[in-house]
Amino acid sequence: TPVGFIGLGNMGNPMAKADRIITMLPSSMNSIEVYSGANGILKEVEKMGAVFMDAPVSGGVGAARICNNMLLAISMIGTAEAMNLGIRDLGLAQDSATSTKTPILLGSVAHQIYRDFSSVFQYLREEETF
């Protein structure tokens, strides 16, 4: 196996046979323990002629959370806009069908479900302010 990751459980044994080991640990204390703790890997890999390379991961948990929330918000804006366009088009289609006496079998049901959901959402929003 050319590359291994420091891990637990079933993955640990195959990783011990890897040519390269990658660690991605949450803190400096964890890294120190993994490399030079009581059962650290540093002594064994040094005997094999291993070298250490550092490539720290930028950012932190807080920054990653903010980035993920921002990406989610951006995608939700697109979803909300698509819903607004869809309900407008559904209303136009329903009006056209009514004026030409052409039934849209599930169109009116979809429109009614949207109206029902909108009123429930409005009610919950008003309750939230109190």
From Swiss-Prot:
The modification N6-succinyllysine is found at K47, K101. GO terms for molecular function: 3-hydroxyisobutyrate dehydrogenase activity. The modification N6-acetyllysine is found at K43, K47. Belongs to the HIBADH-related family. 3-hydroxyisobutyrate dehydrogenase subfamily. Its EC number is 1.1.1.31. The keyword RNA-binding does not apply. It is an enzyme of class 1 (oxidoreductase). It catalyses: 3-hydroxy-2-methylpropanoate + NAD(+) = 2-methyl-3-oxopropanoate + NADH + H(+). Gene3D superfamilies: N-(1-d-carboxylethyl)-l-norvaline Dehydrogenase, domain 2. It is found in: Mitochondrion. SUPFAM superfamilies: 6-phosphogluconate dehydrogenase C-terminal domain-like (SSF48179), NAD(P)-binding Rossmann-fold domains (SSF51735). Keywords: Acetylation, Branched-chain amino acid catabolism, Mitochondrion, NAD, Oxidoreductase. Homodimer. It comes from Mesocricetus auratus. GO terms for cellular component: mitochondrion. Pathway: Amino-acid degradation; L-valine degradation. This is 3-hydroxyisobutyrate dehydrogenase, mitochondrial. NAD(+) binds at residues 1-17, 25-26, 30. GO terms for biological process: valine catabolic process.
